[in-house]
Amino acid sequence: MRLFLVCLAALSVVACHAPSSRGAEGGSRAGGALRIATWNLEWLVAPEDFLALARSCVPEGASPGRRRRTIPCDVAAKLERSTADFDALARYARELDADVVALQEVDGPAAARRVFPGYRFCFSTAPAVQNLGFAVRDGLPFRCGRELADLSLGGRLRSGVELVLHPGTAAELRLLSVHLKSGCGRRTLDSPRDACGVLARQVPVLERWIDAQAAAGRPFAVLGDFNRELLRDAGPARNGSGGLRSLWSEIDDADPPEADLANAAEGERFVNCHPGQNFNGYIDHIVLSRGLAARRVPGSFRRVTFEPREALRRNLTDHCPVAVDLATHAGRDD
């Protein structure tokens, strides 16, 4: 089934406050900078929709049959979010204070609006519950771009979603939100693990999008849950037989020149979302084209973490956002 992008306006605005940024790197935003971020919100579904889905959840090992909008029964049992849970997530979103947020694992605008009031949205409208897209601060010029359906490998996985900021001006900027195959966080893509082979099939699709933007001379960024520790993804792109082995080396080839990429987290200290986690590397990334990397505000990378006691009491998410600031384009047409 073909998927379409929708742009929806947020319905309400709430007052903001600026709590301290526990564990976050970077300081306050430089004047006029654009803050872009990415956040996987782990099965974020509006409460009224969650209850309906929970009543017909799919047990472990069972098939959903022809149903496309389903949630697993373990998700139904553990991830029902209260008003207080949504309020806490919205508070962290205000702390993030991003102009644009690439979103993953969000059912759609009804759920996203509870975390990002005062934003507008571009979302894929897949019948599945785990969609992805963007939240865009109200007032920032944008249009919803095309969907990168080939990234779903025939509907098996998730498509990419494109966003165009300042369309038709000298400041036009392309962003792509992605959520790649899990299960191959560190292994080389030519390892025998099935997940690595699936991820390897997504890489050429991603590289084609990157190269198309680079060839057109456009600044761009890819943001999202790569499910891979790109900062440790070193070595040659291909093995001796020509098989793909490194995602990062394959896409960061400077061919065309704008495809000389930078990871916003490079050189930054890794911080878990809360003390109960024991991960040791980023899998949520902001990948910048050469032109955008030159506009990165030094020291602006930040990771908004959760207050430890709140992380234990609330249904938040197993990911927390990362962000970086970009200096205003000199040729910007406001």
Annotate the PLM regions.
Residues 85-89, 102, 108-111, 131, ...:
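Stable alpha-helical elements in mature extracytoplasmic
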Residues 73-80, 92, 97-103, 150-151, ...:
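Second-shell loop/turn segments in exported
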Residues 168-176, 180-204:
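Metal-dependent phosphoester/phosphodiester hydrolase catalytic core
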Residues 4-15:
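Bacterial N-terminal signal peptides
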